[in-house]
Swiss-Prot record:
GO terms for biological process: N-acetylneuraminate catabolic process. Keywords: Carbohydrate metabolism, Cytoplasm, Lyase, Schiff base. Belongs to the DapA family. NanA subfamily. This is N-acetylneuraminate lyase. The lineage of its organism: Eukaryota, Metazoa, Chordata, Craniata, Vertebrata.
Length: 308
């Protein structure tokens, strides 16, 4: 992995492969890496996040997954970002130390979601305690208020953040509040921090206001198409970029109506990649055969601008 190369473009939020009986399946991660790189043209990953069921895994499982992704990604991936957030500060710190020890490109932390921070200082205090355990590793805040219930605006959080967290590098911004994102980018500018958008169906809007790239689950299987959208946006050919975004949105709108989450993402990924991702961990339950058939048919029916 290229050290300290700027993180931009697409980052696949990886799913966690599991065996039929619910254990993590490390044996397919080498195939997974090769698939992302060769088939999807995605060379950055975000491990043990929401899509990876990170908070449903044990600390030992999270360490094993981080190690395997680092091992299999060596020489193939540009960035391996390890999510180390947890409800327990001590566990989050342990995971941060481990990520640093194995050479992770960066660490990310989600806000605690049971006993929640209620203001900027409380949240910053938690983040600082975790970041300090990996003092040479780039640190990212993972903002996803729909899941955590922590709605502290990122614009507010970033004010003076480098004084508390010298390694602070940017934000995984998984919220639809584009005003908050825009104010962050306007005040901090792209050169200082990295802003990676996390709502796949709205990526083009985020790019328009200055996001550096994106972290998302669809880039596991629609990475190549989304990269073409990024290329069109950069030309700029906005009409072509919109076509890609609208078609991604058409697929997501379809599956969301059927019921779409991590379990269904694993099923779609299995179907498209041919790599067995296995079931989710309870309380999530596996996708139905009906869902899998309908989702596959819908995706195959889409006519992309590149003709593939």
């Amino acid at each position: 992995m290229t050290p300290r190369k700027k993180l931009e473009g697409l980052v696949a939020a990886t799913v966690t492969p599991m065996t039929p009986d619910g254990r993590i399946n490390l044996s397919v991660i080498h195939q997974y890496v090769d698939y992302l790189v060769s088939e999807q043209n995605v060379k950055n990953i975000f491990v043990n996040g929401t899509t990876g069921e990170g908070l449903s895994l044990s600390i030992q499982e999270r360490k094993q997954l981080a190690e395997e992704w680092m091992c299999q990604g060596k020489g193939k991936l540009d960035h391996v970002i390890i999510h180390v957030g947890a409800l327990s500060l001590l566990e989050s710190q342990e995971l941060a130390r481990h990520a640093a020890a194995i050479g992770a490109s960066g660490i990310a932390v989600i806000a605690p979601s049971f006993f929640k921070p209620t203001n900027k200082d409380e949240l910053l205090g938690f983040l600082q305690k975790v970041a300090s355990e990996a003092p040479t590793v780039p640190f990212y805040y993972y903002h996803i208020p729909a899941m955590t219930g922590v709605k502290i605006r990122v614009e507010e959080l970033l004010d003076g953040i480098r004084e508390q967290i010298p390694t602070f590098q940017g934000v995984k911004f998984s919220d639809t509040d584009l005003l908050d994102l825009a104010q962050c980018i306007n005040k901090k500018e792209r050169e200082q921090f990295v802003f990676l958008y996390g709502v796949d169906e709205q990526l083009l809007s985020a790019l328009a206001i200055g996001a550096n790239g994106a972290v998302g689950s669809t880039y596991n299987y629609l990475g190549r198409k989304t990269n073409l959208m990024l290329q069109a946006f950069a030309k700029p050919d906005l009409a072509l970029a919109r076509k890609y975004q609208f078609l991604t949105g058409e697929f997501l709108s379809f599956v969301i109506k059927l019921g779409f989450g991590v379990a269904q993402t694993k099923a779609v990924m299995t179907s498209i990649s041919g790599i067995p991702m296995g079931p989710p961990r309870l309380p999530l339950v596996g996708a139905s055969e009906e869902f899998i058939a309908k989702a596959k048919a819908k995706l195959e029916s889409i006519v992309w601008p590149d003709g593939d």
